[in-house]
Regions:
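Short edge beta-strand/loop segments characteristic of extracellular beta-sandwich folds
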Residues: 151-155
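Bacterial N-terminal signal peptides that target proteins for export
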Residues: 1-8
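Short beta-strand elements of extracellular/lumenal beta-sandwich folds
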Residues: 130-137
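C-terminal motif of bacterial Sec signal peptides marking the signal peptidase cleavage site
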Residues: 16-19
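Structural beta-strand segments of beta-rich domains
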Residues: 146-150
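Proteolytic cleavage junctions
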Residues: 21-97, 108, 141-145, 158-228
Length: 228
């Protein structure tokens, strides 16, 4: 099995909402996104696919690992399903909640390396942003044959989506009507909405990632956000 070193470029994924109008039910086009903030500073843990454990019809995961530096890495292997799941513990209810799940089966091409053969690996690193609800994904420019499946939960915001300190009907309207997954490549770029699937019951977005870099970017930070 050939292993591929990771790139130094980082591509970020974040959740955000924009400011709403003064009227509780009114919404206006945003000048820019306002990132969703954690309702508190959570404690994170991560589990990755355990390649030594083979369970029919189930994903076998390693024991939870505390994220001291808020980052976790795993080897994505072409032709094999590999996953990472990041959870957080809330001091509000003292329960463990899901935050992110990333599953890959077909890492196809790495910048500077080329196409991967079946069984070749690339090291993927996920870094959690502790100030806003978001993560960074690397290596940049990694392309997938079959898209990687990304799922991210936003209930860590505590229901306060517009940042006014309370969770009320305005937040519910924002969530149900205009919340979406967006991204940008660099600070000077406008935000662009992605065709992600939203689950109001789970308070999550799911998106099929064709690659970590949506466009040909050299040394730019790509941010992804939930916005309206």
């Amino acid at each position: 099995m050939k292993f591929v070193r990771r790139s130094i470029l980082v591509f970020a994924l974040a959740l955000a909402v924009a400011r709403c109008a003064d009227q509780p039910t009114a919404v206006k086009a945003p000048a820019g996104p306002q990132f969703l903030r954690w309702a508190e500073t959570p404690q994170f843990s991560a589990r990755t696919t355990d390649p030594r454990a083979r369970r029919s019809g189930a994903m076998a995961l390693t024991p939870p690992l505390s994220l001291e530096q808020y980052a976790v890495s795993f080897w994505a292997v072409r032709g094999e399903s590999r996953s990472v799941q990041i959870n957080y513990r809330s001091s509000i209810d003292n329960n463990v909640h899901p935050f992110l799940q990333l599953t890959t089966t077909d890492p196809q091409s790495v910048p500077g390396v080329g196409e991967l053969a079946m069984g070749d690996s690339v090291l993927i690193t996920v870094t959690v942003d502790t100030t806003k609800i978001g993560v960074s994904l690397e290596p940049s420019g990694l392309q997938f044959g079959a898209p990687a499946q990304l799922k991210i939960w936003y209930d860590g915001a505590g229901g306060d989506l517009n940042g006014d300190g309370v969770a009320d009907s305005t937040d519910a309207a924002i969530e149900a009507q205009v919340l979406g997954l967006w991204y940008r490549e660099k600070d000077s770029d406008p935000w662009t909405k992605l065709g992600a699937s939203q689950s109001l019951d789970e308070k999550s977005f799911t998106y099929a990632l064709p690659h970590f870099c949506e466009y040909d970017v050299a040394e730019a930070l790509m941010e992804w956000a939930v916005n309206y």
